[in-house]
Amino acid sequence: MKKYLKTDEWNIIEDQFHPDRQRMSESIFSLGNGRFGQRGYFEEPYSSDSYRGSFVAGITFLDKTRVGWWKNGFPPYYTRIPKAADWSRINLRLIDEELDLAGWDVDSFNRRLDMKEGISYRDMEVTSPRGNQLRIHVEHITNMARPNLCLIKYSVSSINYTGRISLVPILDGNIVDDADLPNLKIWNILRSGSTSSCAYLWTQTRREDTQVCYAMTYQFFKNNKETTANPIRIEKEKQTGFSVGADVKPGDNVTLIKYTAIASSLYHERSELVEHSVAEAREAKSIGWNTLVEEHRRAWQEIWDETDVVIEGDPEAQQGIRYNIFQLYQTYRGDDPRLNIGPKGFTGEKYGGNTYWNTELCCVPFFLLSTPKEIAKNLLAYRYNQLPKAIENARKLGFKDGAALFPQVTNNGEECHSEWEITFEEIHRNNIIVYAIVQHAALTGNMDYIAKYGLEVMIAVSRFWRQRVSFSQPKQKYVILGVTGPDEYENNVDNNWYTNYSCIQCLKMTLRFLEMVAQQYPDEYAHIRRITNLDQVKESARWRDIIEHMYLPEDKERGIFIQNDGYMDKVLESTDNIPAEERPINQHWSWDRILRSCYIKQSDVLLGLYLYYFYFDTETVRRNFEFYEPMTVHESSLSPHIHSILAARIGKVEKAYQLFLHATRLDLDDYNNEADQGLHITSMPGSWLAIVRGFAGMQVLKETLCFSPVIPQKWDSYSFKVNYLKNTLHIRVRKEIEISLTAGSKVDIQVYGHPYTLERGTELKINMPMC
């Protein structure tokens, strides 16, 4: 772990300069608004170790697949989200000197990310090689209210310097990709230009013809008075901007406000990009900094009013949970079904910005429960819109009759992952998509989506499973061979329990909702039968046969489910036996050694017990938890929160708390020694779920919202809001549980198994057992 950031409930603070941790800090201080985002690199050039990266949502680049041994079914290309132009660049120049913290003395330094208001601040005092001392203050905003705008206020005060200070706002298209192909040239500059106060840079990806135009204007102040400053236009290869400045003496200050508008061909006609971005930049300047910042603050306040979690007595936990919520909303706005959430969001290029099954596991339930807005529905629509591609993906692997295999990794619906043990074998990903569809229905009460869209997906996935299973004559059971389960430290195994069990549940849900739609939505049912060529009697019989005869490996003596065939033949030992200097093992051990070990990357059997909790009693969960958790290294960000939830449910509250901190502060404390590459965005909602579904014990049982709260010893209280069936409940847990209905009319709930009816304006108070 790396603990160098200050603990504060609403702020992330780095109170001294850490050049050895610059890349990690750039990840931590990332900014975004769902349409674009940037790592938290310095606005001015920095010649030491740095990972500068800016990204625009929905912009992808197709890169040819490169593998040592080509296998039929491999995708021909890999999609990635490329670095975009650097729109935040501001150079600071003195006479014959230019600010570069790699070569200047940093006398004081404070960087602060205000999560409540969504503003990044940087304050520092620096001394140049020639002894010139300056005080610098920077405010940086990616506007949540106007999602095409970025705002930067860059202020410089002279401490002992007499002479000219020039500030140089630039749009920089001279970008080098930081992924595995640093020499890959992704962007063409179509045109750049400037007037006396506005510059633009019009760009296009080389292979997809996707276009982005950046436009920038500015205001310049000396001693808080605006001046025109006689700008010098800058036009270089792939760069455009201005140099503005003033003569200063000690005590004087200059300030530049940079207004940047970003427009992409995802939202605008190509022929209008320049005009639109220039107009929006100019409009921003006319509106002014103060008004734009206030709009931005209000937008964040609306988000926090819905989603904030308050933890009293534990500032580290409070900081962590707010940070995770903050970064998730910086990454995804939820207003465009063409977009999804990449594992790194706008904080890095790893994973190519692609969509994984993390979205359905963590993000969909978070948005379903935390906001009345239909954000989750757009994530489901993203998958529905890609159903034809999923059917095509399955066809490439030999499946037919409308069977669908959703990709492990995608930006456009086509598979673009080229590790065979993942692409071909981690097929459990299909089931979490069906699970998310059903969760949407269960938590919103809206069955229309299933009738119009969801059932079509469920049928296609169920057809895949009917063809993917094999019937074992010796076992007289259906088996699923050659798979990788959620634990990616086990490859090409047979009968992964989670895969087999989630297959059963997928088929059950399809059968259930087929009957529901047939009865309640006859027109939609007729449409689905027609477009899918469904033979319900014949196909349902096959699905039921698989459900009834699926092989599920178990150890009856231990009372546990076996992760997969052969797992129990391994040397079973605790992670305590791994030397600290060899963690994480994926950064120190050979792949052969990992595969032969018993160590589990992430929740596997336990993931099934979490998702399908209503089928398992507490003792079953306890036995499996106590067997598998000691062998789990949690080297996937998807793991700690699942274990935390289960630990809370079986009464291991302090263990749940330790795992919660792991999930909540995974990036802030760099548990896995990889925060420098970017944040773990799609697992961040897991920390929220660990509170709501773990400590608060929220479950839906027999269409009733149920709570069984516990509280970690360190906490005085915790509180949150949750949405269920168009109702919003506020829950506070301390020595007594307080539940009120803040939106809606009436809802039936259970607390510790006892039924209650909540009405608007009333509050339920219940003493916590044993307190």
Give the ranges of each region predicted by the language model.
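Active-site core of glycosidic bond-cleaving carbohydrate-active enzymes
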Residues: 355-361, 365-384, 508, 512-515, ...
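Non-catalytic C-terminal accessory modules of carbohydrate-active enzymes
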Residues: 76-129, 134-135, 618, 622, ...
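Structural helix-adjacent loops and short alpha-helical linkers that scaffold large soluble proteins
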Residues: 311-318, 335-336, 369-380, 441-456, ...
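Acidic/polar, glycine-enriched structural segments that form the non-catalytic walls/loops
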Residues: 1-351, 589-593
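Gly/Pro-rich turn-and-neighbor structural signature
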Residues: 305-339, 343, 500, 525-566
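Helix-terminus loop motifs that line ligand-binding clefts
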Residues: 332-347, 373-435, 441, 448-452, ...
